[in-house]
C-alpha cells in the first residue's frame, strides 16, 4: 500500500493549493495592517498596594498595631512572595508582591482574595484607623501626558480648563483611565487668634460644630399635595466664601460675626502635598491611559484629533505641551523594528539567490513571505502585536525557517540532476526529508520551551518570542512540504544537468578538512572537548546582566531628601537645579518636575514611586541618544557636588521589569536599632568598591519630635483630656476641617487653624489656652511639659522584619552582577559576624535576574525531555541520540568567544538565545545523522556514508548558518537584542563547523568505523 505523500497530494490538487496560497498571502497582508503596535509587550505587575491611616500615631505605633496585623494576615496567602512596607507617622503602605511564577490569569482573583482577607481583620485595628485602601491597578499606564500652563490665569481657572479637557478626552474611543496631575486643591482658611478667642471665652471646636450643623445636608422629607409629591429643601448650605462671611455665631448666649473671631482667606492647601512643573513653569498635567487590547496607533490618532479641538477652544495665554506621546514613540520604534525585519528578509533572499541560482532562489523568495503571511494571521488571531519581542522573534526565525525551503529546493534540484522528472523530484522532498525536517523543527521549538513556560515577569515579557518562533517554524515546515514542491514544479526547469561533477575549491577544501578530522578522530574530539572546557572557564570573564537600559532619550532623576524634609525644601532644591542646569541646556528638549510625588507610569517598565513630601522626580527628555549619556554625566556630577545630604540619582529607563538602583543589599533583623547599626557598617563594605557611587540607605536617620507629656492627674482635675489637647494642637498647627463649600464640581474644605505667627512657634503652643470643664481657660503649659525627642520617621519592613536597603549606582559599563561577584568575599565575611536572626540579602538587578532565571532552570529538564523524546521517535537509538545531543553544548565555544570579542554581557535575552541554539544545532545534527543512516541502509560503506552525507549536507547547513547569522546583523545594533545576536551568531558559526567536522569524527569513533574503508570503497568504484 502506498503511503500518504503530502507533496504528491499538493500536486494532485494544484488549483486548491494555489487558491489557499493566494488566500494566505492576502490574509497575511491584511493581518499585518491590523496588528497592534507597541514598543514593548505587556507584562503583569504582580504588586498590590495597601494603605491605611491612623492619625496621631507614631511610625512605631502604626507598625505594631496596623502594619504588623496586615502583614501577618497576608502571610496566609499561598502565592505570596514577600511583603514590603513603609510606615510613617500616621500612615502605612504595604506592598504585596506575588510569586514570580504566579500566572497572569490568577493575579486578579488573588487581589480579590486579599481584599476579603484584610476585611476579616478590620475589627482588630485600633479605634481611629482609616482604611485599609487597596490599589490593585498599580500597573496602569498613562502613555499620553499633556502639561497645561498659563500666563495670567489662577490655578483654579487653569484647573477648570483641564477638567473640561478631561471630559472631552473621555469621549475618545478606547480611552482608559484619565488623571489630573499637580492640581492644587482650594481651601478656605478660618484663621483664629488663640488669645482673642480665649479672651472672649470662645471654643474653636464650638465654632466648627456650628458651621457643620448649618452646612449639613439632611433629608427633609416630602409632602403629598393632592396629585403632586413635593420635596422639601432646607437652605443654609455654604456655596461660596461670601456665604461664610455672612455667618453670625451664637456661643454661650452671645452673637458674634464669624469675621470678628476669624480671618477668612480663600487660597490653596498650604503646604501643598504635590507640585508639577513643565520647563520650570507651574503646570497642571493630564495623564491619559488606553484600554487594554486597543490599537495604540489608532488610539493616538483619535486622541490627537480630540486634543486639537481642545486646544482650539482654549483662551489666549493657555499653552498645552506634549510631555509624553507613547503612540509616536511606538510608531517610531515599530518602524525601526520593521526596517530591521525587512533588512533581514533582504539578506536571506540575497543569500538564497546567490547560493541557489535565480530559479531555485525564486522558490525560496516566495516561500519566505508565505510563511510570514501565515504567521501574521496567527499573530492577529492570538492577539500578539508588533513590538520589540515579536519582531525580534521573526528576525531570529528567518534564519531558521529558510532552512526548510532550502532543504526542499536542494532536494528537488539534486533529484533533477540525478535524472528524475520534475514531479518525482518534488514528491521525493516529502519521502526523504519531511520527517527529519519535522523532527528538527519540533526540537528547535522545544529549545524555546523555557520561555513559553516561564511565568515570571521577564518570562511574560518575552513570551511572544516563543509563540512567534514556534508558529513560524511549524508553518515553515508545512510550507516546505505542501507549497514549496508546487512552486518548484512551476518555477524550476523540467530537467537539469549536474553542477557537482567537479568539486569547487571550497568543497575540495572542506572534503580535505573532513577527511583530516575523521582520520584524526580522537585528536578532533580531544581538541573540541578541551576548547569547550576553556569556554566554560571563559564564562567567568563574561559580564552578567538582567535587562539592558532603554534606548530612549529620557533621563530620570529621583530626589530623596532626608525624611524630615518639608515639601518646601524639596521644591527649593529641585527648582534651583532646574534654573542652574536645565533652563539653558541646549541638549535638553524639555523636562517635567514632580515634587512630593513621582511621575505617572508612562511606560509599563517605569519604576513608580509612592508620594512623599521629601521625594521628587525630574523627567528630562534629551535631544537624542548621542547627547543623553553626556548630559547624564554632567547632571550627576553637579548633583553630587551641590546637594550634599540629598540622594539625587540620574538613571535611564529600563527595558523589561524595573529594578531601581542596580546594586542593592538588604539588611534585616528583629531590632530596628541593631539593623540601623549593621546597615551603616555594611555601607562601609559596599563603599570599599571603587566602581560604586551614589550609595544611600533607604531609611536610617531619626528626626526630632516634640513630646508633650500630659500631667494626667492635673489635667483630669481641670476636666481636660489628652484627646482635647491633641485636637486643640492639631487645630492650631495643621488645622481641622470644619466643613466643605460645594463649589461646582469641587468640594472646598473649610479649615480652622491658628494664625501663622502663632502656629510656627513652640512657645505659642505652650501658651495655648485650653477650655476647662468649668468654663475657664488654662495654658497648655499648666497641664503638660514639652521636651524634644528623636523618633524614627520611617520604618521599612520586608516579611515583617525591619529592613534597610543599601543601594548604589555603578560607574562605567561594568554590570551589577560583576560588582556583586567581586563583593561576595567581603559580604560573606560580614555575614559571619552577624548576630542570630540578622541577615544580608542581595537585591536589585542581580536578584531580579535570579528570579527570572529560576523558572528557566526549573523548566530546562522538561525541555531536554521533550527534545530527547522527539529525537528518540525519529532515531530510535540511544547511540544516535547521544551523537545528536553531543554537538549542542559545544556551541558555548562560539557564544563565549563572541561575547568576549564584542564586550557584550550575558543577559536574560542572551540566555534565551543560547537555549535556542541547542535546538538549532540539534536540528542540523539529526538531519545529518538520518542522512548517514539512510545511505548506510542503501548499502553504502559506513565511512563513505559519513563522508557522502556530510558533504551533501554541508551546502544547506552552511547556507542556513549564513542566513541565520547574517539575518541577525540588523538587530545586533539594538541595545536589547545585541548581546543575544552576538551570542547566537558566535554559537551558530562554531556550532555549524563542529556539526560538519566534530560530529562525523565522533560518529566514526563511536561506531568504531575503520578509516581504510573509504580507500577500499574508492578502489572498488574505480574497478
Segments the model singles out, each with a brief description of its role:
Residues 19, 58-65, 102-113, 142-146, ...:
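Solvent-exposed, non-transmembrane alpha-helical starts
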Residues 323, 330, 334, 409, ...:
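Helix-loop junctions and hydrophobic alpha-helical segments within the transmembrane domains
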Residues 15, 23-57, 105, 119-128, ...:
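Transmembrane helices with small-residue packing motifs
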Amino acid at each position: 500500500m502506498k503511503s500518504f505523500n503530502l507533496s504528491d497530494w499538493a500536486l494532485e490538487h494544484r488549483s486548491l493549493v494555489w487558491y489557499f496560497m493566494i488566500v494566505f498571502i492576502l490574509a497575511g497582508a491584511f493581518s499585518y495592517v491590523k496588528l497592534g503596535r507597541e514598543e514593548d509587550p505587556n507584562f503583569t505587575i504582580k504588586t498590590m498596594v495597601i494603605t491605611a491611616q491612623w492619625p496621631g500615631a507614631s511610625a512605631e505605633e502604626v507598625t505594631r498595631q496596623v502594619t504588623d496585623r496586615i502583614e501577618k494576615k497576608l502571610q496566609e496567602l499561598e502565592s505570596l512572595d514577600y511583603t514590603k512596607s513603609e510606615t510613617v507617622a500616621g500612615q502605612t503602605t504595604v506592598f504585596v508582591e506575588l510569586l514570580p511564577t504566579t500566572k497572569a490569569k490568577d493575579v486578579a482573583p488573588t487581589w480579590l482574595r486579599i481584599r476579603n482577607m484584610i476585611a476579616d481583620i478590620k475589627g482588630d485595628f485600633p479605634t481611629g484607623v482609616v482604611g485599609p485602601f487597596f490599589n490593585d491597578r498599580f500597573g496602569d499606564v498613562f502613555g499620553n501626558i499633556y502639561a497645561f500652563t498659563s500666563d495670567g490665569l489662577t490655578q483654579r481657572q487653569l484647573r477648570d480648563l483641564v477638567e473640561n479637557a478631561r471630559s472631552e478626552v473621555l469621549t475618545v474611543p478606547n480611552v482608559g483611565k484619565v488623571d489630573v496631575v499637580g492640581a492644587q486643591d482650594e481651601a478656605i482658611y478660618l484663621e483664629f487668634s488663640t488669645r482673642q478667642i480665649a479672651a472672649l471665652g470662645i471654643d474653636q471646636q464650638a465654632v466648627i460644630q456650628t458651621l457643620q450643623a448649618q452646612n449639613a445636608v439632611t433629608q427633609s422629607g416630602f409632602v403629598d399635595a393632592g396629585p403632586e409629591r413635593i420635596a422639601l429643601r432646607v437652605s443654609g448650605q455654604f456655596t461660596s466664601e461670601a456665604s461664610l462671611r455672612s455667618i453670625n455665631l451664637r456661643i454661650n448666649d452671645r452673637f458674634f460675626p464669624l469675621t470678628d473671631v476669624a480671618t477668612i482667606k480663600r487660597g490653596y492647601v498650604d503646604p501643598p502635598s504635590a507640585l508639577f512643573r513643565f520647563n520650570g513653569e507651574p503646570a497642571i498635567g493630564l495623564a491619559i491611559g488606553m484600554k487594554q487590547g486597543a490599537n495604540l496607533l489608532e488610539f493616538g490618532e483619535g486622541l490627537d484629533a480630540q486634543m486639537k479641538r481642545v486646544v482650539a477652544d482654549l483662551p489666549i495665554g493657555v499653552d498645552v505641551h506634549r510631555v509624553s506621546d507613547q503612540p509616536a514613540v511606538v510608531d517610531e520604534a515599530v518602524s525601526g523594528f520593521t526596517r530591521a525585519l525587512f533588512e533581514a528578509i533582504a539578506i536571506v533572499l540575497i543569500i538564497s539567490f546567490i547560493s541557489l541560482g535565480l530559479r531555485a532562489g525564486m522558490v525560496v523568495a516566495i516561500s519566505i513571505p508565505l510563511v510570514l503571511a501565515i504567521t501574521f494571521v496567527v499573530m492577529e488571531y492570538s492577539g500578539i502585536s508588533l513590538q520589540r519581542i515579536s519582531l525580534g522573534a521573526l528576525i531570529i526565525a528567518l534564519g531558521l525557517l529558510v532552512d526548510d525551503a532550502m532543504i526542499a529546493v536542494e532536494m528537488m534540484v539534486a533529484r533533477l540532476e540525478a535524472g528524475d522528472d520534475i514531479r518525482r523530484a518534488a514528491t521525493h522532498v516529502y519521502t526523504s526529508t519531511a520527517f527529519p525536517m519535522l523532527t528538527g523543527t519540533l526540537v528547535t521549538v522545544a529549545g524555546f520551551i523555557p520561555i513559553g513556560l516561564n511565568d515570571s515577569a521577564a518570562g511574560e515579557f518575552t513570551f511572544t518570542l516563543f509563540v512567534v518562533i514556534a508558529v513560524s517554524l511549524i508553518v515553515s515546515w508545512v510550507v516546505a512540504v505542501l507549497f514549496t514542491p508546487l512552486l518548484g514544479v512551476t518555477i524550476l526547469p523540467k530537467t537539469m544537468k549536474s553542477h557537482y561533477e567537479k568539486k569547487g575549491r571550497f568543497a575540495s577544501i572542506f572534503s580535505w578538512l573532513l577527511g583530516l578530522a575523521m582520520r584524526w578522530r580522537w585528536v578532533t574530539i580531544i581538541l573540541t572537548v578541551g576548547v569547550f572546557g576553556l569556554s566554560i572557564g571563559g564564562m567567568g570573564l563574561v559580564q552578567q546582566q538582567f535587562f539592558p537600559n532603554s534606548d530612549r532619550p529620557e533621563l530620570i532623576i529621583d530626589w530623596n531628601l532626608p525624611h524630615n524634609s518639608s515639601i518646601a525644601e524639596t521644591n527649593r532644591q529641585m527648582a534651583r537645579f532646574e534654573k542652574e542646569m536645565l533652563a539653558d541646556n541646549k541638549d535638553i528638549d524639555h523636562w517635567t518636575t514632580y515634587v512630593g510625588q513621582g511621575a505617572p507610569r508612562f511606560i509599563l517598565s517605569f519604576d513608580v514611586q509612592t508620594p512623599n513630601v521629601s521625594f521628587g522626580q525630574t523627567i528630562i527628555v534629551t535631544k537624542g541618544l548621542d547627547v543623553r549619556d553626556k548630559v547624564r554625566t554632567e547632571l550627576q556630577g553637579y548633583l553630587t557636588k551641590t546637594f550634599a545630604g540629598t540622594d539625587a540619582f540620574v538613571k535611564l529607563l529600563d527595558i523589561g521589569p524595573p529594578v531601581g538602583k542596580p546594586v542593592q543589599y538588604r539588611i534585616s533583623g528583629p531590632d530596628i536599632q541593631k539593623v540601623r547599626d549593621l546597615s551603616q557598617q555594611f555601607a562601609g563594605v559596599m563603599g570599599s568598591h571603587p566602581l560604586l557611587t551614589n550609595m544611600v540607605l533607604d531609611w536610617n536617620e531619626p528626626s526630632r519630635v516634640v513630646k508633650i507629656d500630659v500631667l494626667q492627674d492635673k489635667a483630669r482635675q481641670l476636666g481636660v483630656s489628652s484627646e482635647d489637647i491633641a485636637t486643640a494642637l492639631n487645630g492650631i498647627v495643621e488645622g481641622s476641617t470644619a466643613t466643605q463649600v460645594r463649589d461646582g464640581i469641587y468640594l472646598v474644605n473649610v479649615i480652622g487653624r491658628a494664625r501663622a505667627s502663632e502656629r510656627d512657634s513652640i512657645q505659642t503652643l505652650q501658651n495655648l489656652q485650653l477650655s476647662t470643664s468649668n468654663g475657664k481657660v488654662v495654658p497648655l503649659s499648666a497641664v503638660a511639659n514639652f521636651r524634644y525627642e528623636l523618633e524614627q520617621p520611617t520604618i521599612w519592613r520586608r516579611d515583617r522584619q525591619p529592613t534597610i536597603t543599601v543601594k548604589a549606582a555603578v560607574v562605567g559599563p561594568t554590570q551589577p552582577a560583576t560588582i556583586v561577584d567581586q563583593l561576595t568575599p567581603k559580604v560573606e565575611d560580614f555575614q559571619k559576624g552577624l548576630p542570630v536572626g540578622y541577615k544580608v540579602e542581595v537585591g536589585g538587578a542581580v536578584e531580579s535576574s535570579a528570579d527570572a532565571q529560576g523558572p528557566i532552570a526549573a523548566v530546562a529538564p522538561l525541555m531536554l525531555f521533550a527534545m530527547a523524546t522527539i529525537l528518540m521517535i525519529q532515531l530510535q537509538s540511544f547511540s544516535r541520540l547521544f551523537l545528536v545531543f553531543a554537538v549542542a553544548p559545544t556551541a558555548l565555544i562560539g557564544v563565549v568567544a563572541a561575547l568576549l570579542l564584542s564586550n557584550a554581557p550575558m543577559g536574560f535575552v542572551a540566555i534565551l538565545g543560547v537555549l535556542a541554539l541547542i535546538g538549532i544545532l540539534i536540528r542540523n545534527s539529526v538531519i545529518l545523522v538520518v542522512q548517514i543512516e539512510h545511505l548506510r541502509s542503501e548499502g553504502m560503506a559506513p565511512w563513505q556514508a559519513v563522508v557522502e552525507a556530510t558533504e551533501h549536507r554541508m551546502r544547506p547547513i552552511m547556507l542556513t548558518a549564513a542566513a541565520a547569522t547574517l539575518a541577525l546583523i540588523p538587530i545586533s545594533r539594538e541595545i536589547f537584542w545585541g548581546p543575544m545576536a552576538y551570542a547566537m551568531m558566535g554559537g551558530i558559526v562554531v556550532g555549524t563547523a563542529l556539526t560538519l567536522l566534530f560530529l562525523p569524527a565522533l560518529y566514526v569513533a563511536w561506531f568504531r568505523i575503520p578509516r581504510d574503508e573509504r580507500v577500499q570503497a574508492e578502489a572498488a568504484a574505480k574497478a
